[in-house]
Amino acid sequence: MKANIAMASKQLQFIRSLIISQPPTIALPNQSSNISKIENIKGNDLPNQKTLNDPEFQSLGQPASVLAINSPPSVPIYIRKNSLLSIYGIDNSFVNSIKGSVEFINPLKRFIYGGYVSKYQKIISTVPFSLLVSSSSKNFRLRTNRQKSFATLLLDGTNDWAVLNNTALQAYTGGTLNVSMFRIPKNISKTLASLLKITNATETGLFRWNNLGYALLTGRGQVGLVGNGAIYNINLKENEEVLISRKNLLSISVNGPYDLQNCIVKYSFPVTKPETGTIGSTKEAPVQLNKDDVIPANNFNHYWNIIKGYSRHIINFFKRSQRLTYNFLVGNEDFVRVIGPRNLLLQSNSVGSHSTSSSELPKPNLSNIKANIEKKSSDFLNYVTIEPGRGAVFKSTPNFRESVQKIEKKSS
Protein backbone atom coordinates (compact mmCIF):
# COMPACT_ATOMS: atom_id res chain seq x y z
CA MET A 1 0.00 0.00 0.00
CA LYS A 2 2.84 2.40 0.84
CA ALA A 3 4.54 1.53 -2.45
CA ASN A 4 1.40 2.37 -4.42
CA ILE A 5 1.09 5.71 -2.63
CA ALA A 6 4.72 6.50 -3.39
CA MET A 7 4.27 5.65 -7.09
CA ALA A 8 1.13 7.80 -7.25
CA SER A 9 2.94 10.75 -5.69
CA LYS A 10 5.74 10.39 -8.24
CA GLN A 11 3.28 10.31 -11.14
CA LEU A 12 1.47 13.42 -9.95
CA GLN A 13 4.69 15.39 -10.09
CA PHE A 14 4.68 15.18 -13.92
CA ILE A 15 1.15 16.56 -14.36
CA ARG A 16 0.96 20.25 -15.29
CA SER A 17 -2.14 22.09 -14.18
CA LEU A 18 -4.08 23.75 -17.01
CA ILE A 19 -4.44 27.50 -16.47
CA ILE A 20 -7.51 29.20 -17.91
CA SER A 21 -7.30 32.99 -17.86
CA GLN A 22 -9.55 35.82 -18.96
CA PRO A 23 -7.26 38.56 -20.27
CA PRO A 24 -8.71 41.43 -22.30
CA THR A 25 -5.76 41.21 -24.68
CA ILE A 26 -4.14 38.03 -26.02
CA ALA A 27 -0.54 39.09 -26.69
CA LEU A 28 1.79 36.82 -28.64
CA PRO A 29 5.55 36.71 -27.88
CA ASN A 30 7.97 39.37 -29.16
CA GLN A 31 5.46 42.16 -29.24
CA SER A 32 6.37 45.73 -30.04
CA SER A 33 7.37 47.70 -26.95
CA ASN A 34 5.83 50.99 -28.12
CA ILE A 35 2.24 49.86 -27.50
CA SER A 36 0.99 51.35 -24.24
CA LYS A 37 -2.15 50.63 -22.24
CA ILE A 38 -5.02 53.04 -21.71
CA GLU A 39 -7.65 53.08 -19.01
CA ASN A 40 -10.34 55.11 -20.74
CA ILE A 41 -10.86 57.80 -23.32
CA LYS A 42 -9.70 60.96 -21.56
CA GLY A 43 -8.12 64.18 -22.63
CA ASN A 44 -4.62 63.25 -21.52
CA ASP A 45 -4.83 59.86 -23.24
CA LEU A 46 -5.63 61.13 -26.72
CA PRO A 47 -3.06 60.09 -29.32
CA ASN A 48 -2.42 63.65 -30.49
CA GLN A 49 -0.96 64.52 -27.06
CA LYS A 50 1.56 61.69 -27.07
CA THR A 51 3.75 59.82 -29.50
CA LEU A 52 1.71 56.97 -30.99
CA ASN A 53 3.12 54.88 -33.80
CA ASP A 54 0.56 52.06 -33.84
CA PRO A 55 -3.17 51.96 -33.03
CA GLU A 56 -4.22 50.96 -29.52
CA PHE A 57 -7.01 48.48 -28.83
CA GLN A 58 -8.36 48.37 -25.26
CA SER A 59 -11.50 46.60 -24.09
CA LEU A 60 -13.58 48.43 -21.48
CA GLY A 61 -16.12 47.33 -18.90
CA GLN A 62 -16.92 44.17 -16.97
CA PRO A 63 -17.74 42.27 -19.07
CA ALA A 64 -15.75 43.97 -21.82
CA SER A 65 -18.65 45.04 -24.04
CA VAL A 66 -16.95 48.17 -25.49
CA LEU A 67 -13.68 48.50 -27.42
CA ALA A 68 -11.68 51.76 -27.23
CA ILE A 69 -9.40 52.45 -30.21
CA ASN A 70 -6.75 55.20 -30.32
CA SER A 71 -5.43 55.66 -33.84
CA PRO A 72 -2.53 57.73 -35.20
CA PRO A 73 -2.95 59.68 -38.45
CA SER A 74 -3.30 57.96 -41.83
CA VAL A 75 -3.96 54.50 -40.37
CA PRO A 76 -7.22 52.88 -41.54
CA ILE A 77 -9.47 51.24 -38.95
CA TYR A 78 -12.00 48.62 -40.05
CA ILE A 79 -15.06 48.05 -37.88
CA ARG A 80 -18.24 46.13 -38.50
CA LYS A 81 -21.07 48.17 -39.92
CA ASN A 82 -23.51 49.63 -37.33
CA SER A 83 -21.19 48.89 -34.38
CA LEU A 84 -19.57 52.36 -34.07
CA LEU A 85 -20.59 54.23 -30.91
CA SER A 86 -18.59 57.47 -31.08
CA ILE A 87 -15.64 59.29 -32.65
CA TYR A 88 -13.64 61.66 -30.46
CA GLY A 89 -10.91 64.23 -31.11
CA ILE A 90 -9.12 67.00 -29.20
CA ASP A 91 -10.85 69.83 -31.10
CA ASN A 92 -13.51 70.37 -33.72
CA SER A 93 -11.07 70.26 -36.62
CA PHE A 94 -10.92 66.45 -36.56
CA VAL A 95 -14.50 66.18 -37.90
CA ASN A 96 -13.55 67.54 -41.31
CA SER A 97 -10.44 65.36 -41.53
CA ILE A 98 -12.17 61.99 -41.01
CA LYS A 99 -13.23 59.98 -44.04
CA GLY A 100 -15.31 56.82 -44.06
CA SER A 101 -16.29 54.22 -46.63
CA VAL A 102 -18.03 50.83 -46.68
CA GLU A 103 -16.12 47.77 -47.84
CA PHE A 104 -16.98 44.10 -48.31
CA ILE A 105 -14.34 41.58 -47.25
CA ASN A 106 -14.34 38.42 -49.37
CA PRO A 107 -18.06 38.71 -50.10
CA LEU A 108 -18.30 35.68 -52.40
CA LYS A 109 -16.42 33.30 -50.11
CA ARG A 110 -18.24 34.57 -47.04
CA PHE A 111 -21.58 33.96 -48.73
CA ILE A 112 -20.59 30.45 -49.85
CA TYR A 113 -18.90 29.37 -46.62
CA GLY A 114 -20.97 31.27 -44.08
CA GLY A 115 -24.26 32.04 -45.79
CA TYR A 116 -24.00 35.83 -45.33
CA VAL A 117 -22.05 38.90 -46.46
CA SER A 118 -20.74 41.25 -43.75
CA LYS A 119 -20.02 44.92 -44.31
CA TYR A 120 -17.15 46.79 -42.66
CA GLN A 121 -16.72 50.53 -42.28
CA LYS A 122 -13.27 51.90 -43.10
CA ILE A 123 -12.36 55.00 -41.06
CA ILE A 124 -9.20 57.03 -41.68
CA SER A 125 -8.12 60.53 -40.66
CA THR A 126 -5.25 62.95 -41.16
CA VAL A 127 -5.19 63.72 -37.42
CA PRO A 128 -5.19 61.39 -34.41
CA PHE A 129 -8.62 60.29 -33.19
CA SER A 130 -10.32 57.82 -30.84
CA LEU A 131 -13.22 55.41 -31.39
CA LEU A 132 -15.69 53.54 -29.24
CA VAL A 133 -16.94 50.29 -30.77
CA SER A 134 -19.83 48.22 -29.43
CA SER A 135 -19.72 44.44 -29.15
CA SER A 136 -23.10 44.12 -30.91
CA SER A 137 -24.03 45.43 -34.33
CA LYS A 138 -27.55 46.64 -35.08
CA ASN A 139 -28.29 44.05 -37.72
CA PHE A 140 -31.72 42.52 -38.12
CA ARG A 141 -30.19 39.12 -38.80
CA LEU A 142 -27.94 39.20 -35.76
CA ARG A 143 -30.31 40.91 -33.34
CA THR A 144 -30.14 39.08 -30.03
CA ASN A 145 -30.32 39.68 -26.32
CA ARG A 146 -27.23 37.65 -25.51
CA GLN A 147 -24.37 39.36 -23.68
CA LYS A 148 -21.20 39.71 -25.75
CA SER A 149 -17.66 40.72 -24.86
CA PHE A 150 -14.41 41.72 -26.57
CA ALA A 151 -10.99 40.09 -26.73
CA THR A 152 -8.14 41.74 -28.64
CA LEU A 153 -5.38 39.92 -30.52
CA LEU A 154 -1.91 41.30 -31.22
CA LEU A 155 -0.42 39.58 -34.27
CA ASP A 156 3.31 39.95 -34.91
CA GLY A 157 3.57 37.63 -37.92
CA THR A 158 4.83 34.54 -36.10
CA ASN A 159 1.41 32.96 -35.54
CA ASP A 160 -1.86 32.97 -37.42
CA TRP A 161 -5.35 32.70 -35.99
CA ALA A 162 -8.33 30.74 -37.30
CA VAL A 163 -11.60 32.40 -36.26
CA LEU A 164 -14.28 29.70 -36.34
CA ASN A 165 -17.20 32.01 -35.59
CA ASN A 166 -17.80 34.04 -38.74
CA THR A 167 -19.53 36.84 -36.81
CA ALA A 168 -16.67 37.29 -34.30
CA LEU A 169 -14.49 39.70 -36.30
CA GLN A 170 -15.68 43.12 -35.07
CA ALA A 171 -12.70 45.45 -35.63
CA TYR A 172 -9.16 45.20 -37.01
CA THR A 173 -6.28 47.26 -38.31
CA GLY A 174 -2.81 46.68 -39.71
CA GLY A 175 -0.99 47.46 -42.93
CA THR A 176 0.11 43.85 -43.46
CA LEU A 177 -2.86 42.18 -41.77
CA ASN A 178 -4.69 39.86 -44.16
CA VAL A 179 -8.22 38.52 -43.55
CA SER A 180 -9.13 35.59 -45.80
CA MET A 181 -11.72 32.80 -45.88
CA PHE A 182 -10.92 29.08 -46.09
CA ARG A 183 -12.94 25.89 -46.06
CA ILE A 184 -13.12 24.00 -42.78
CA PRO A 185 -11.44 20.59 -43.19
CA LYS A 186 -13.80 17.67 -42.81
CA ASN A 187 -11.22 14.99 -41.96
CA ILE A 188 -7.96 15.10 -40.04
CA SER A 189 -4.60 14.96 -41.80
CA LYS A 190 -2.50 11.84 -42.27
CA THR A 191 0.12 13.29 -39.94
CA LEU A 192 -2.33 13.59 -37.06
CA ALA A 193 -3.82 10.18 -37.87
CA SER A 194 -0.40 8.52 -37.65
CA LEU A 195 0.35 10.40 -34.42
CA LEU A 196 -2.90 9.20 -32.85
CA LYS A 197 -2.52 5.73 -34.47
CA ILE A 198 -5.81 6.01 -36.34
CA THR A 199 -6.15 3.92 -39.50
CA ASN A 200 -9.58 4.91 -40.82
CA ALA A 201 -10.80 8.33 -41.93
CA THR A 202 -11.69 10.46 -38.88
CA GLU A 203 -13.56 13.75 -38.87
CA THR A 204 -12.27 16.94 -37.30
CA GLY A 205 -15.66 17.64 -35.72
CA LEU A 206 -15.72 21.26 -36.97
CA PHE A 207 -17.34 20.73 -40.36
CA ARG A 208 -21.02 21.68 -40.63
CA TRP A 209 -23.05 22.11 -43.80
CA ASN A 210 -24.48 25.40 -42.55
CA ASN A 211 -21.00 26.74 -41.68
CA LEU A 212 -18.40 25.60 -44.19
CA GLY A 213 -15.62 28.14 -43.68
CA TYR A 214 -13.53 30.07 -41.20
CA ALA A 215 -11.66 33.39 -41.23
CA LEU A 216 -7.86 33.21 -41.26
CA LEU A 217 -5.89 36.13 -39.78
CA THR A 218 -2.29 36.43 -41.00
CA GLY A 219 0.38 39.13 -40.93
CA ARG A 220 0.85 41.95 -38.44
CA GLY A 221 -1.90 43.98 -36.82
CA GLN A 222 -4.51 44.14 -34.11
CA VAL A 223 -7.92 42.47 -34.07
CA GLY A 224 -10.97 42.88 -31.86
CA LEU A 225 -12.98 39.65 -31.60
CA VAL A 226 -16.47 39.35 -30.14
CA GLY A 227 -17.76 36.26 -28.36
CA ASN A 228 -20.99 35.23 -26.68
CA GLY A 229 -20.64 35.72 -22.93
CA ALA A 230 -17.13 35.97 -21.48
CA ILE A 231 -13.98 35.00 -23.43
CA TYR A 232 -11.23 32.86 -21.88
CA ASN A 233 -7.75 31.94 -23.07
CA ILE A 234 -6.24 28.45 -22.80
CA ASN A 235 -2.56 27.88 -23.57
CA LEU A 236 -1.64 24.30 -24.46
CA LYS A 237 1.97 23.19 -24.46
CA GLU A 238 3.58 20.44 -26.51
CA ASN A 239 1.64 17.12 -26.44
CA GLU A 240 -1.03 18.53 -24.12
CA GLU A 241 -4.66 17.81 -24.93
CA VAL A 242 -8.01 19.26 -23.94
CA LEU A 243 -11.65 18.50 -24.78
CA ILE A 244 -13.60 21.55 -25.93
CA SER A 245 -17.23 21.99 -26.86
CA ARG A 246 -17.31 22.81 -30.57
CA LYS A 247 -19.93 25.53 -30.14
CA ASN A 248 -17.81 27.30 -27.49
CA LEU A 249 -14.56 27.27 -29.47
CA LEU A 250 -14.15 30.82 -30.78
CA SER A 251 -10.63 30.89 -32.25
CA ILE A 252 -7.42 28.85 -32.32
CA SER A 253 -3.82 29.64 -33.26
CA VAL A 254 -2.60 27.91 -36.42
CA ASN A 255 0.40 27.90 -38.74
CA GLY A 256 -1.05 28.59 -42.16
CA PRO A 257 -4.40 27.78 -43.78
CA TYR A 258 -3.92 23.99 -43.76
CA ASP A 259 -2.82 23.53 -40.16
CA LEU A 260 -6.31 23.27 -38.66
CA GLN A 261 -6.59 19.60 -39.62
CA ASN A 262 -3.35 18.83 -37.74
CA CYS A 263 -4.58 19.68 -34.24
CA ILE A 264 -8.32 18.94 -33.92
CA VAL A 265 -10.15 15.62 -33.99
CA LYS A 266 -13.76 14.78 -33.21
CA TYR A 267 -14.41 13.17 -29.83
CA SER A 268 -17.39 11.09 -28.79
CA PHE A 269 -17.98 10.04 -25.22
CA PRO A 270 -18.33 6.27 -24.82
CA VAL A 271 -21.96 5.29 -24.42
CA THR A 272 -22.57 2.63 -21.77
CA LYS A 273 -25.75 0.60 -21.76
CA PRO A 274 -27.80 0.71 -18.57
CA GLU A 275 -27.37 -2.33 -16.37
CA THR A 276 -30.37 -4.64 -16.26
CA GLY A 277 -30.28 -6.01 -12.76
CA THR A 278 -32.81 -7.95 -10.75
CA ILE A 279 -33.65 -4.99 -8.57
CA GLY A 280 -37.30 -4.21 -8.80
CA SER A 281 -38.02 -7.34 -10.87
CA THR A 282 -40.02 -9.02 -8.15
CA LYS A 283 -43.70 -9.09 -8.94
CA GLU A 284 -46.01 -7.64 -6.41
CA ALA A 285 -49.34 -9.22 -5.64
CA PRO A 286 -52.18 -7.34 -7.32
CA VAL A 287 -54.43 -5.38 -5.01
CA GLN A 288 -58.02 -6.56 -5.15
CA LEU A 289 -60.65 -3.87 -4.81
CA ASN A 290 -64.24 -4.47 -4.02
CA LYS A 291 -66.95 -2.87 -6.04
CA ASP A 292 -68.16 -1.00 -3.00
CA ASP A 293 -64.69 0.48 -2.44
CA VAL A 294 -64.49 2.06 -5.90
CA ILE A 295 -66.19 5.45 -6.06
CA PRO A 296 -67.50 6.16 -9.58
CA ALA A 297 -66.23 9.43 -11.04
CA ASN A 298 -69.06 11.15 -12.82
CA ASN A 299 -67.48 14.58 -12.74
CA PHE A 300 -66.47 16.09 -16.09
CA ASN A 301 -63.32 17.65 -14.60
CA HIS A 302 -62.15 14.24 -13.48
CA TYR A 303 -62.23 12.85 -17.03
CA TRP A 304 -60.76 16.06 -18.41
CA ASN A 305 -57.78 15.77 -16.05
CA ILE A 306 -57.28 12.18 -17.16
CA ILE A 307 -57.24 13.25 -20.83
CA LYS A 308 -54.77 16.04 -20.10
CA GLY A 309 -52.53 13.64 -18.18
CA TYR A 310 -52.41 11.14 -21.05
CA SER A 311 -51.84 13.96 -23.55
CA ARG A 312 -48.92 15.24 -21.49
CA HIS A 313 -47.38 11.77 -21.41
CA ILE A 314 -47.75 11.44 -25.18
CA ILE A 315 -46.09 14.82 -25.82
CA ASN A 316 -43.20 13.98 -23.47
CA PHE A 317 -42.80 10.64 -25.23
CA PHE A 318 -42.44 12.30 -28.63
CA LYS A 319 -39.98 14.87 -27.25
CA ARG A 320 -37.89 12.15 -25.65
CA SER A 321 -37.98 10.11 -28.86
CA GLN A 322 -36.85 13.13 -30.86
CA ARG A 323 -33.95 13.76 -28.48
CA LEU A 324 -32.87 10.12 -28.51
CA THR A 325 -33.06 10.00 -32.31
CA TYR A 326 -30.91 13.13 -32.60
CA ASN A 327 -28.32 11.74 -30.18
CA PHE A 328 -28.26 8.48 -32.12
CA LEU A 329 -27.80 10.10 -35.54
CA VAL A 330 -25.61 13.09 -34.63
CA GLY A 331 -23.86 12.06 -31.41
CA ASN A 332 -24.29 12.25 -27.69
CA GLU A 333 -21.99 15.27 -27.23
CA ASP A 334 -20.50 17.82 -29.64
CA PHE A 335 -16.90 17.88 -28.41
CA VAL A 336 -13.55 18.12 -30.17
CA ARG A 337 -10.11 17.07 -28.99
CA VAL A 338 -7.43 19.74 -29.37
CA ILE A 339 -3.75 18.77 -29.31
CA GLY A 340 -1.06 21.28 -28.38
CA PRO A 341 0.92 23.42 -28.71
CA ARG A 342 -1.98 25.82 -29.31
CA ASN A 343 -3.64 28.96 -27.98
CA LEU A 344 -7.42 28.75 -27.69
CA LEU A 345 -10.12 31.34 -27.19
CA LEU A 346 -13.34 30.06 -25.62
CA GLN A 347 -16.68 31.81 -25.34
CA SER A 348 -18.73 30.95 -22.27
CA ASN A 349 -22.04 30.92 -24.15
CA SER A 350 -22.58 28.99 -27.34
CA VAL A 351 -24.54 30.21 -30.34
CA GLY A 352 -27.58 28.02 -29.64
CA SER A 353 -27.52 28.25 -25.86
CA HIS A 354 -30.35 30.79 -25.79
CA SER A 355 -32.80 28.42 -27.46
CA THR A 356 -33.27 26.15 -24.49
CA SER A 357 -36.61 24.53 -24.03
CA SER A 358 -38.47 25.25 -20.84
CA SER A 359 -41.51 23.43 -19.60
CA GLU A 360 -44.43 25.66 -18.84
CA LEU A 361 -46.38 25.21 -15.67
CA PRO A 362 -50.10 24.59 -16.12
CA LYS A 363 -52.23 27.63 -15.50
CA PRO A 364 -54.72 27.29 -12.68
CA ASN A 365 -58.38 27.05 -13.59
CA LEU A 366 -60.39 29.71 -11.76
CA SER A 367 -63.58 27.69 -11.89
CA ASN A 368 -61.93 24.74 -10.16
CA ILE A 369 -60.43 27.05 -7.52
CA LYS A 370 -63.80 28.64 -6.79
CA ALA A 371 -65.47 25.24 -6.63
CA ASN A 372 -62.88 23.99 -4.18
CA ILE A 373 -63.25 27.10 -2.04
CA GLU A 374 -67.05 26.96 -1.98
CA LYS A 375 -67.10 23.24 -1.28
CA LYS A 376 -67.92 22.54 2.35
CA SER A 377 -65.77 20.20 4.34
CA SER A 378 -67.38 16.97 5.52
CA ASP A 379 -66.26 14.14 7.76
CA PHE A 380 -66.26 10.58 6.45
CA LEU A 381 -66.41 7.66 8.89
CA ASN A 382 -65.18 4.16 8.22
CA TYR A 383 -66.93 1.06 9.48
CA VAL A 384 -66.50 -2.66 9.03
CA THR A 385 -69.09 -5.38 8.55
CA ILE A 386 -68.73 -9.14 8.58
CA GLU A 387 -70.38 -10.67 5.53
CA PRO A 388 -70.65 -14.41 4.87
CA GLY A 389 -68.22 -15.57 2.21
CA ARG A 390 -66.42 -12.21 2.08
CA GLY A 391 -65.20 -11.75 5.60
CA ALA A 392 -64.45 -8.27 6.89
CA VAL A 393 -65.55 -5.52 4.51
CA PHE A 394 -64.41 -1.91 5.12
CA LYS A 395 -66.64 0.92 3.94
CA SER A 396 -66.86 4.68 4.40
CA THR A 397 -69.95 6.77 5.03
CA PRO A 398 -70.67 10.49 5.55
CA ASN A 399 -73.51 9.71 7.97
CA PHE A 400 -72.81 7.03 10.50
CA ARG A 401 -76.40 6.94 11.87
CA GLU A 402 -77.99 6.23 8.48
CA SER A 403 -75.47 3.47 7.79
CA VAL A 404 -76.27 1.79 11.13
CA GLN A 405 -80.00 1.93 10.39
CA LYS A 406 -79.44 0.34 6.96
CA ILE A 407 -77.40 -2.45 8.51
CA GLU A 408 -80.07 -3.12 11.15
CA LYS A 409 -82.85 -3.25 8.52
CA LYS A 410 -80.76 -5.57 6.36
CA SER A 411 -80.04 -7.96 9.26
CA SER A 412 -83.68 -8.00 10.41
UniProtKB/Swiss-Prot annotation:
Give any single GO term for biological process: inner mitochondrial membrane organization
Is the keyword Transit peptide assigned to this protein? yes
- Which compartments is it annotated to reside in? Mitochondrion
One GO CC annotation: mitochondrial inner membrane
Pfam families referenced in this protein's UniProt entry, alphabetically: AIM24
Q: Its principal location? A: mitochondrion
Transit peptide residues according to the UniProt entry: 1-25
**According to its UniProt record, which protein family does this protein belong to?**
Belongs to the AIM24 family.
Name of the protein in its database record: Altered inheritance of mitochondria protein 24, mitochondrial
Q: Where are the transmembrane segments?
A: none
Which InterPro entries does the entry link to? AIM24, AIM24_sf
| Keywords, in A-Z order | Mitochondrion, Transit peptide
| Keyword set includes Mitochondrion | yes
Name the species this protein comes from.
Debaryomyces hansenii (strain ATCC 36239 / CBS 767 / BCRC 21394 / JCM 1990 / NBRC 0083 / IGC 2968) (Yeast)
